[in-house]
Curated annotation (Swiss-Prot):
Cofactor note: Binds 1 copper ion per subunit. Binds 1 zinc ion per subunit.
Name of the featured protein: Superoxide dismutase [Cu-Zn]
S-S bonds: 58-147
PROSITE patterns: SOD_CU_ZN_1, SOD_CU_ZN_2
Top-level enzyme category: oxidoreductase
The protein's assembly and partners: Homodimer.
Alphabetical GO biological process terms: cell redox homeostasis; intracellular zinc ion homeostasis; removal of superoxide radicals
Region of interest (Disordered), ranges: 62-89
Organism, as annotated: Yarrowia lipolytica (strain CLIB 122 / E 150)
Cofactor: Cu cation; Zn(2+)
InterPro entries assigned: SOD-like_Cu/Zn_dom_sf (IPR036423), SOD_Cu/Zn_/chaperone (IPR024134), SOD_Cu/Zn_BS (IPR018152), SOD_Cu_Zn_dom (IPR001424)
GO molecular function terms attached to this record: copper ion binding; superoxide dismutase activity
Subcellular location: Cytoplasm
Lineage, uppermost ranks: Eukaryota, Fungi, Dikarya, Ascomycota, Saccharomycotina
Its biological purpose: Destroys radicals which are normally produced within the cells and which are toxic to biological systems.
Length: 154
């Protein structure tokens, strides 16, 4: 089993932890998240971005991780970036906790997400269906209040 973690921090009150686990190279990755400081009762875009660079805040993380050059989509769409994880839903206190499984994410090999950045966005991801100019690139998910580089863990 391969495990990785990202500690989310940023220029805002949003913070949290995201863990990634993969039992085998061909198996899905289990993503567990606990993120606080968001607006209450909201959906927020949640993506893996290309670079593990946060030198200029979360902007330095670059675009969504997209090694297959696809359009943006939802996590269950066939046409999507590898890094498209959809939205997390916050509770009445602005906390998003949950678990998801994703078959495109990998923790080993050429398209590994280790060393890249996971970002929580300030708006809802329209999953590529919003009709906005940015829908097919970013899901029009807005700013990047918090992010963290994904690193291997024991």
């Amino acid at each position: 089993m391969v495990k990785a973690v990202a500690v989310l921090r940023g220029d805002s009150k949003v913070s949290g932890t995201v863990t990634f686990e993969q039992d085998s190279e061909s198996g899905p990755v289990t993503v567990t998240y606990d993120i606080k400081g968001n607006d209450p009762n909201a959906e927020r875009g949640f993506h893996v971005h290309e670079f593990g660079d946060n030198t200029n805040g979360c902007t330095s993380a670059g675009p969504h991780f997209n090694p297959f050059k696809k359009n943006h989509g939802g996590p269950t769409d066939s046409e999507r970036h590898v890094g498209d994880l959809g939205n997390v839903k916050t509770d009445s206190e602005g906390v998003a906790k949950g678990v998801l499984k994703d078959s495109l994410l990998k923790l080993t090999g050429d398209n590994s997400i280790v060393g890249r950045t996971v970002v929580i966005h300030g708006g809802e991801d329209d999953l590529g269906k919003g009709g906005h100019a940015d829908s097919l690139k970013t899901g029009n998910a807005g700013p990047r209040p918090a992010c963290g580089v994904i690193g291997l863990t024991a």
